[in-house]
UniProtKB/Swiss-Prot annotation:
It is a multi-pass membrane protein. It is found in: Membrane. It comes from Caenorhabditis elegans. The gene is tag-175. PANTHER family: PTHR43220, TRANSMEMBRANE PROTEIN 41B. Belongs to the TMEM41 family. One of its GO terms (cellular component) is endoplasmic reticulum membrane. One of its GO terms (biological process) is autophagosome assembly. Its main location: membrane. Pfam families: VTT_dom (PF09335). Keywords: Membrane, Transmembrane, Transmembrane helix. This is Transmembrane protein 41 homolog.
Amino acid sequence: METKSSQTSHPWLVLLIFATFAVSIFAVYSNFPEVSADEKVHLKYPRNLEDAKQLGRVLSKYKENNYSVVLCGVIVVYVFLQSFAIPGSIFLTILSGYLFPFYVAIVLVCSCSATGAAICYTISKLFGRSFVLQKFPERIAKWQDDLSKHRDDFLNYMIFLRVTPIVPNWLINIASPVLDVPLAPFFWGTFLGVAPPSFLYIQAGSTLEQLSHTSVAWSWSSIVLLTGSAILSLAPILLKKKLKSD
């Protein structure tokens, strides 16, 4: 049970997390090389595909001589967006595919997604329980009943949820601590589960200049990839059920 003093400290902890991100973003911005006034207006997190294109052009111009600054900037902003459930990470995923080699981009996106989700999880665990229970009472009750039967399969369920678009990622992040999902399977399930959809957007990002909308990342082959990944994530659970029934 939480004490009154620990409950009081929670808002300060969130402010500390927010301040840490603010300082980190400022540090990256301060270490970025001098840019023209026209370029400076595009140094912001992308809200749409056109923003991503403009930002990509600026970052790619300075990336060769300032690789670590560009990389750190993408990481800090990506984790920040994930931590506070701010829309825009999909465009950073596409941008990562444009700026970095595939293997760097996929590790970056999976790591940032898992880290940001874990921070969001922690914030929700500290003081978001009443909000989640009040806003989503029926869903939480149903999920609690379902998960109570599969306490040993949290990792597989988390991978499945991240691969499929059944539940919004932000809702998974804030509901998981309320459902007593341990942080370890939550983190690694997120890391592994976001890989298949991120693969598609990173590939699309390699042709960012030609993209007209984000839906071009989707095709029958991409649907097959995600469906196959979802089935594989549930395969151990289904196999375990079959062995028990036999």
